[in-house]
Amino acid sequence: MRFVFIDETENSTHVPGFYAVCAVAVDATKYNRVRQAVDKALDDCGWCRDHEFKGSVIFSSTKGDTSVTTEQRVDAANSMVAATVSKANARVSCAIAWTDKGGGVKQHLELVVQAVSRCLVPAGKAAGKDLVAVFADNKDQIKPRDLSDAIKKAVKSRGYALVEDVVIVSSSCDWPGVLLADVLAYLGMWTYAGHKLAGSQLSLFEGGIEPSADVLRKMGTVQEVLESGAALQFVPKLV
């Protein structure tokens, strides 16, 4: 059995038009280690679980838990990436589907299908290996039935049967799989910005203030992992 976690990201101010959906697939036997990796990253930086940790707070010390510095947030994100999608520690299969045309309802559903179908390996033939449970972040503009239909289409294309229905959640630290999907989607935007939009990576930092050399070095390492890790795939742009 596998679990799939879905979240999306965008930043219309600094990366105009970019919209991405990330799907993270985890074998049930590896889920607990993924959860522990996310929990450890949050514990190590002292993050208060009353505040949501997500991609958009990584570069801002005034969002979320304000007692945690930008450097500590970057360390937490770096730790999550290293423990889940790096070549040495790959415990998930992740796909980021994206467009530069913005995130309308139609685009969102198409990106969900792309990301989910790409992150899942073909279903195994042993008993229970063809089952998948899917958890997705709530998005007000998307009707639950439309999301469910899109996901059923995606998992069926890889030979899976959906357990019950899609579980739609409100993001929080209590949903580490969805949290990880959000962080990876945002870091995917960071990677996109570095290749396509001159100066836009730095603009993602709060106030557009250039971070320390140490933070930039760590983010460079994160980008290298995302671009080289076999566990993460960037789906060709949706046009």
Model-flagged regions — what are they?
Residues 1-239:
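Phosphate-ester processing/binding pockets and catalytic centers
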